Regions:
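Conserved catalytic cores of phosphodiester-cleaving nucleases, focusing on short active-site segments
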Residues: 189, 193, 215-242
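Catalytic cores of nucleic-acid endonucleases
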Residues: 230-231, 235-280
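Beta-rich nucleic-acid/ligand-interaction surfaces
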Residues: 207-216
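A structural preference for short, hydrophobic beta-strand core positions in alpha/beta folds
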Residues: 202-203, 265, 285
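Acidic-basic catalytic patches of nuclease active cores, encompassing PD-(D/E)XK
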Residues: 158-208
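Domain-level recognition of nuclease-like catalytic cores that cleave nucleotide substrates
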Residues: 269-304
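Eukaryotic low-complexity, intrinsically disordered regulatory segments enriched in serine, proline
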Residues: 27-37, 192, 290-304
Length: 304
């Protein structure tokens, strides 16, 4: 099953399309995304361009790449004179718009290469500055972004709403979807372990025991996967690219290895195949729940 356009699907285990990519395949997708904007319409085009790849994989790659692009350029959009120019352009156009057409916002965020949700945040922040006579609180700003009906200007509220639902990388809707998808994959992992009658402790149980930094799963009895011992499993509902995997290694995976021993990372939406190079050091990568799990107690009963 594919998710709705621009959203991630949790049915990754049964998706036959490629999720483990060579670096060359990954770079081909990245090159094509460089000139794209983070809208659901662009995701439809991306899906048509690479039909052999999971839509969830493509969206995850696109989102990671666009976020890198945004981090490099976001500071220039936050300059006071730039925000003022965006807002004045909006005010001039909004006065002359009789309908709730999205033509202005669509034109603006395409021209300046800023995601719809981030542009909406800048415009709303500036609008509230006039309305309240000072800098609005983040609480008020965030509540209006999540619930645009709270915005007193109905035309602006409609624009904010449309920007939020049209953005596939940023905004409260995307944040909510990503959080839900992450939790669903953790539940999926637990269900798979229970199907195999494997005893484990989940993250909540481990924290209750006093652990502060833990993987999603600690196996009470280690298993072997493709000949490698696994003590813990980490679930990642994203694509594993060079930058994110390097960050996870430094901030999470090696600390898990130091404390709990070798483990398994599941990138449910795929990863660059060349990154699976730490197996001998104790970190195994997969893009689905492994089918060849061997429990150590079972292995001990095998004849020599």
């Amino acid at each position: 099953r594919e998710a709705a356009d621009g959203e991630l699907s949790t049915d990754t285990a049964s998706d036959p399309r490629k999720m483990r990519l060579s670096r060359a395949e990954y770079k081909q997708i990245v090159r094509w995304t460089e000139q794209q904007r983070p809208t659901r319409q662009c995701m439809k085009v991306l899906k048509d361009k690479f039909p052999n790849h999971s839509q969830s994989t493509l969206l995850s790659i696109f989102s990671l790449e666009y976020q890198k692009r945004t981090k490099r350029t976001i500071s220039r959009h936050h300059a006071p004179d730039v925000i003022e120019s965006y807002y004045q352009r909006y005010c001039i156009i909004a006065v002359s718009i009789a309908s709730y057409s999205l033509c202005f916002f669509s034109h603006l965020y395409h021209c300046v290469d800023l995601s719809p949700a981030l542009m909406a945040r800048l415009i709303l922040d500036r609008f509230l500055l006039d309305l309240e006579g000072g800098m609005p609180s983040k609480t008020i700003l965030n509540s209006m972004l999540k619930e645009p009906s709270l915005i007193p200007d109905q035309i602006l509220a409609k624009h904010i709403y449309q920007c939020t639902i049209n953005d596939c990388c940023y905004g409260p809707l995307v944040d909510c979807i990503k959080h839900a998808i992450g939790q669903e994959h953790e539940v999926l992992l637990c269900d798979k372990l229970k199907e195999r009658n494997l005893s484990f402790l989940d993250e909540n149980q481990l924290r209750a025991m006093g652990y502060d930094k833990t993987p999603d799963i600690i196996l009470e009895v280690p298993v072997a996967v493709e000949g490698h011992i696994v003590h813990w499993i980490e679930s990642k509902a994203s694509f594993g690219d060079d930058h994110s995997h390097r960050t996870y290694l430094n901030e999470q995976f090696w600390s898990y290895w130091n404390r709990f021993g070798p483990g398994l990372v599941i990138y449910w939406y795929g990863f660059i195949g060349e990154l699976d190079c730490q197996r001998d050091r104790g970190i195994l990568l997969k893009d689905c729940f492994p089918t060849d799990i061997v429990t150590l107690c079972h292995a001990a009963q095998q004849p020599e």
